[in-house]
Amino acid sequence: MIRFLQHSEINPEKWNQAVRNSLSPNVLSEYELLDLLTGDDTWHALVQDDYETVMPLPTRKKGVLKYVYTPFFLPQMGIFHRQELPQYKFDLFLEEVSEHYVLADLLMNEQNTWDWKKGLTPYFVSYALFLHLPYNELYSQFHENTRRNIKAAQKQQSQVTLQEEKVADIIALFRNNRGQGENVHFRDDDYTRLQRVSDYLLEHNLLEVYGVRTAQNELAAGALFVKDGKRRWFWFSGRDNQLSETKPMFLLLDTYIRDHAESDLELDFNGSNNPNVARLYQSFGGTRYPIPFHRVYKNKFWRLLLTIARKGSMQ
């Protein structure tokens, strides 16, 4: 039986166990982190039986209308299940979502690919790199241009730091550079939320902080990697555009891969809709995989109404 639970009805311990024991565990979808990621909003959930299968539903309101959204800095959501989930059960979860919301934008996870395999749903793309090989073998899989950029960065005599940079400085790098682009929609509250989540992750030894400083000790780039079991999320990064000629991000990622080579870890580049960023991830030997996206409407009336409203807002 699938139940809709309000936030206050969710058992935190059972929730976390369900996510951790699923086929697609994700520390950022655990109870405490969902609380931080949703901030002033909230989240509810669909729960099957005694937390055998769970689905988080971050919730916002526009007027009297409730809808599900994907919070910034949450790489994947979807349905968390311990065993293979049949198509009909997947459909039941989506139908249950439509019973409670007029609209739901659902970013799934790599185990929720039924409709994607049939070509019935759009998807985002991510890249993952298994780090079990020796560094030299991993390096040999980098694209030629990437190896060239790494060598150029090494000639700059920049230094890579570990757990020395402040998260706030890396956030500022992004905010003052790429964050000024018209396609970036982060608000002040989003940056504040990112800092709070980072503080929690640091406190629980779940965050690796890498930085690159030039020969003049200027912070050229920084990145935050989330430790999630055997997965490492390339979660957030920033770069100083004025120091881009030093190729700091190439040096940073190369160093991270070198540091973690010959381990049972997987580096997940966390995807990007920016084709230039996606090419960067692929150039480090990452393997492409899909993250399905579902848009669920309460009924045909709401689908038509919301489609008209969206078109009107674009004019």
Name each region found by the language model.
Residues 2-49, 55-64, 109-244:
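A conserved beta-strand-loop-helix scaffold within acyl/acetyltransferase catalytic domains
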Residues 41-43, 99-103, 207, 262-264:
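Short, high-confidence coil segments that cap the C-terminus of an alpha-helix
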Residues 61-76:
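Conserved acyl-donor/pantetheine-binding loop and adjacent beta-alpha core of acyl/acetyltransferases
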Residues 75-83, 242:
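The substrate-binding groove and active-site-proximal loops of carbohydrate-active enzymes
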Residues 86-126:
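Non-catalytic accessory segments adjacent to catalytic cores
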Residues 88-95, 196-304:
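Aromatic (often tryptophan-rich) hydrophobic motifs at membrane interfaces
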Residues 105, 161, 266-270:
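Short catalytic-loop micro-motif centered on adjacent basic/acidic residues
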Residues 111-156, 263, 271-315:
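Terminal substrate-recognition subdomain of acyl/acetyltransferases
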